[in-house]
Amino acid sequence: MEYLQITSFDDYRVEEIYKSYCETFPEDERRSEQQFRHLFSNPRVKVFSVLKDLKNIGYLISWELTNFVFIEHFEIFSEFRSLKYGSEIISHLYKNYSHIVLEAEPEDQDENAARRISFYEKNGFMVIDDNYVQPCYDPEKNSLNLWLLANWKPEKTDWIKEEIYDVVYC
């Protein structure tokens, strides 16, 4: 598997990534096109296209924060799901980052959310905050009640949430 960092919104892969991003994530869970474009000029953000056998199979959007990496979005394109690629990507992340944090819908939201939580737990993540609120991306969108997961058990989560709120959603 290859991980190609995309450094420009004009990269041809971004069209496929952004299209899938808009189709997969509900409007309240995603950035506008302008906000997405700005990710590429932020030095803390890394957008990766994930390739398997020279095919784009998905992407990661990560934020390198003070003491952890925050995975804002992680998607395997629909035609490549259920092939264990997600677990391979998580394994790759573990090799590169000791502390990883991400958000997910509560498992009682629907069957897909329950599967997603199960996937993350099987891959070493645990729920560290089940009262987490994802701030809205802009005033026309809603904040969301999500779960915060990590691959380690911090004593407190306030500092994690504070940095996510101040850097990712500012």
Each language-model region and where it sits:
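Short amphipathic alpha-helix that is part of the acyltransferase structural core
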Residues: 1-31, 145-146, 155-170
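Conserved beta-strand in the GNAT
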Residues: 49, 55-75
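Conserved GNAT acetyl-CoA-binding A-motif
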Residues: 96-112, 117
